[in-house]
A protein has these predicted regions:
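Bacterial Sec-dependent N-terminal signal peptides
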Residues: 1-24
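C-terminal beta-rich recognition modules with glycine/proline-rich loops and embedded aromatic residues
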Residues: 24-29, 308, 372-381, 386-476, ...
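Aromatic (Trp/Tyr) and acidic
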Residues: 24-125, 129, 160-198, 235-253, ...
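Extended, charge-enriched "interface" segments that sit outside catalytic cores
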Residues: 142-143
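Asp-box/WD-like beta-propeller blade repeats and closely related beta-sheet repeat scaffolds
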Residues: 156-179, 205, 211-229
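Aromatic-lined ligand-binding clefts that engage carbohydrates, nucleic acids, or primary amines
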Residues: 486-492, 711-717
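Beta-strand-rich ligand-recognition modules
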Residues: 506-526, 532-546, 679-700, 704-706, ...
């Protein structure tokens, strides 16, 4: 037992076996908290938090690590900005990271959700006291403000005041000068609703209602054009939370308000089955789709259903990596184009947090093994892999670069969006292991050691499983009395020769149309289901490169560990050379209990040890491998090495890279502009400044070297594109994009005079258009130092 588990057990020893569930509300059977019943028939209901508990497994290890983190967070520090903005004296110093920046307040919402769920599972009075304290503090802030509003970020009164007047200035993450303010409001509202759902705190519900009413007042004077302009800025799950508030209160005004947060630009094409996702910020979109899925449950709106179904299939089958995650630098690319999108910034963790929520809603209406094949894949290989199980810290991105390494959050000085969702991710591993069918059946969706206590049926079901190290799962039933019902067990996609037996008797059945084995009988006390799901090694290719493959064993993605020193980009990441395409011929088992494998003389230039991706931490790795036949490798080796050599040379010289139109890079580079426009073409985003406008940003330089700016443009423009390039207000070049006559990207270099960079670590670059011209479009900026 490692130290983190011992520490966690000391913290939560008196709690017994904890079971935690998710922030998201999935329909429960005969839920008395819900006044508005579902218009859409629900076929699979969620179990209550108190009904499922985890047994020993890697999932429980991760859960305990997260509980440790939640235990050391100080509510007064998360509440600091709320009290300050309400005119009250803060009781703690505000945390760092995004909490000390423009998104202050979002973490409190996630934290409130997490500890509310923790109380629902454990009934620990200390946790309840913490929830109640936060609610009392927020109510005090609401009373002091006298408007119903709750917020913690700077300049918020001006931001909302301008919006209420109908003044809407917006970009992808900016609304009237504020960083995605509706995103933060959503997190607070969701946290309040969770406190009500999971602890019964009625003050939390009242506070959420007051915040929703304030929302209505703020946007009441905006016409549809202004609302749609407002929605260009990320707004989180506002629509979903308002639908849930409608379901709880029965007040239709909240359903109507949810439609005010309907982004026509994105959602209408999706309803028509059009993939308009390339170039879009992934995590901005997914909560919009969750709202559609939830609203369809309540209202039966067919438009919402079309959106949710099409989006899920599009993301899962055309935009996702082997981990089940999606996005590169937070953005989606062209469908089925991922081969050149392996970087340090792949697969934002928030995306998968939200995709699992969406999957849960779709399953409630139409249960299928297909949905949980994805859920399982993403849970093992992205969510579980995004946490350092030793200390509970989380990844913003889970890098898939060949030879990459995970970067984890800091306890008190990060607080990004993915720390917020991570607080919840790792305390909810039991949320969807089981479901209750509308016909009284039991769904077994995931193979995770756990106990289900189904009180209404008088059933306690214990699941013991060897997965993923072994292939046997046992379900043992304890019943207060014999009962006839169906048990539905998912047949996983990764296993073909499955067998299922009851009390040792093999069942001659096949999966039904949903992909589940259905066993209907009169169940008795101590009945036992034995389920064997043979695992094997197999590969999954990149959609646009069949020779670049990831290796799986059962549900688990394997990673090749490459040491604690960054591998050489040319020789440090092996390629696989084999005439045999079957991965079982590539690997030897080193330790089955740890799922440790080793390549058998097929990796060049050296063989590699492979382990579950979720076990990698503080080491470099690769999950994708370039696979060659010996004949192909003989031809390709020189070309392959030369390409990697050139890329390494460029990376070694690179001081800074700036991609336009992306949230964090633009913040990191102090991007400002006037009369600018933004777009996406040729798979990349661009910025352009019109006449009398400008584009300005900071870049890193070497104070003792010759620095060169490399700008990326697209040729064959044939319009007024003449502009000056200034460094610290000194003109270093004049550019005319009409010089570039081919329809392709051009990488154009501009040397920075030594006197402008000497002694400096950064400079300010400005693109200023000539009269009757524009500056740009410019797609990216790279700064290199010359040798």
């Amino acid at each position: 037992m490692n130290k983190i588990i011992i520490k966690c057990l000391l913290i939560v020893a008196f709690l017994g076996v904890a079971d935690i569930k998710a922030q998201n509300y999935f329909p429960q059977f005969n839920d008395s908290r819900i006044k508005v019943k579902n218009s859409t028939p629900i076929k699979a209901y969620a179990f209550d938090l108190s009904q499922v508990s985890l047994l020993e497994s890697t999932f429980k290890t991760a859960m305990l690590a997260d509980e440790c983190y939640l235990a050391v967070i100080d509510p007064d520090r998360l509440l600091s900005g709320f009290r300050k903005n309400a005119g009250l004296e803060p009781k703690g110093k505000i945390y760092g990271g995004w909490e000390g920046d423009g998104l202050a307040g979002h973490s409190l919402g996630h934290y409130l959700s997490a500890i509310s769920m923790q109380y629902a599972s454990t009934k620990d009075p200390a946790v309840l006291a913490k929830v109640n304290y936060i609610i009392d503090e927020l109510v005090a802030c609401q009373k002091a403000r006298k408007s119903g509003y709750l917020g913690a970020f700077g300049n918020e009164d001006k931001i909302w005041g301008e919006l209420a007047k109908g003044n809407v200035k917006t970009g992808g993450f900016d609304l009237n000068g504020g960083w995605s303010p509706w995103y933060t409001v959503h997190k607070i509202m969701a946290g309040l609703l969770d406190a009500y759902f999971y602890t019964g705190n009625k003050k939390a519900l009242s506070a959420s209602i007051d915040l929703a009413d304030w929302t209505q007042n703020i946007i009441s004077k905006l016409n549809d054009e202004l609302l749609q302009k407002m929605l260009f800025c990320e707004y989180g799950g506002m629509a979903e939370t308002l639908v849930n508030l409608y379901a709880i209160t029965g007040e239709k005004k909240y359903l109507d308000l949810s439609y005010k947060f309907y982004d026509k630009r994105i959602l209408d094409p999706l309803a028509k089955q059009q993939d308009i996702l390339p170039g879009k910020h992934s995590n901005t979109q997914i909560p919009k789709i969750i709202a559609s899925a939830r609203r369809h449950e309540i209202t039966g709106d067919q438009n919402d259903q079309a959106i949710a179904d099409f989006f899920w299939k599009t993301i899962v089958y055309h935009h996702s990596y082997a981990t089940g995650g999606n996005s590169n630098y937070e953005y989606l690319s062209e469908p089925n184009k991922l081969n050149d999108k392996l970087t340090e910034n792949t697969t934002e963790t928030c995306n998968t947090y939200n995709m699992l929520k969406l999957t849960g809603h779709l399953f409630a209406e139409n249960p299928s093994a297909e949905l949980f094949d994805y859920y399982e894949k993403a849970l093992y290989n992205h969510i579980l892999a995004s946490q350092n199980h030793d200390d509970g810290m989380m990844c913003y991105f889970v890098p898939l670069r060949m030879g990459g390494k995970k970067e984890y959050s800091d306890q008190f000085n990060t607080f990004t969006c993915c720390v917020g969702t991570g607080m919840e991710n790792h305390v909810k591993y039991n949320e969807s292991i089981y479901s209750r069918g509308d016909d009284g059946s039991l769904y077994v969706n995931l193979f995770i050691p756990s106990v289900l206590n189904w009180k209404e049926r008088g059933l306690t079901l214990t699941q013991q499983t060897a997965l993923p190290q072994g292939d046997q799962t046992t379900l043992t039933l304890k019943l207060t009395k014999a009962s006839t019902f169906s048990i539905r067990v998912r047949k996983p996609k990764w296993s073909t020769e499955t067998t299922i037996a009851v009390n040792g008797e093999l069942q001659k059945i096949t999966p039904d149309q949903t992909g589940y084995y259905v066993i209907t009988r009169k169940w008795k006390n101590d009945d036992k289901i034995s389920y064997v799901t043979p695992e094997k090694l197999y590969t999954e290719a990149m959609p646009d490169n069949t020779d670049r493959r990831a290796v799986f064993f059962g549900p688990v993605l394997l990673a090749g560990v490459l040491g604690t020193t960054e591998p050489d980009p040319i020789k440090g990441v092996p390629v696989f050379v084999s005439a045999n395409k079957d991965p079982k011929e590539w690997l030897n088992v080193v330790d089955q209990s740890e799922l440790k494998f080793h390549t058998k003389n097929i990796a060049q230039p050296q063989d590699v040890t492979m382990i579950p991706f979720y076990q990698t931490k503080n080491q470099f790795y690769s999950v994708y491998w370039d696979v060659f036949t010996p004949e192909k490798w003989a031809v390709q080796q020189k070309i392959y090495d030369e390409q990697k050599r050139k890329q390494k040379e460029l990376e070694d010289k690179t001081l800074d890279v700036f991609r336009f139109g992306e949230m964090q890079p633009e913040r990191d580079h102090n991007f400002t502009a006037a009369k600018e426009s933004m777009g996406e073409e040729h798979g990349s985003k661009w910025r352009m400044a019109g006449e009398e406008g400008f584009i300005q940003f900071d870049v890193k330089v070497d104070p003792n070297a010759q620095n060169t700016i490399i700008a990326s443009y697209w040729g064959m423009d044939n319009r007024g594109r003449n502009f000056d390039i200034l460094v610290d207000n000194v003109n270093i070049a004049t550019e005319d994009l009409n010089r570039y006559k081919e329809s392709r990207f051009y990488e154009i270099s501009y040397k920075i005079p030594l006197e402008l960079s000497k002694g400096k670590t950064k400079v300010t670059v400005k693109l200023s258009p000539k009269a009757k011209n524009s500056a740009g479009p410019v797609y990216s900026i790279r700064v290199i130092k010359e040798k």
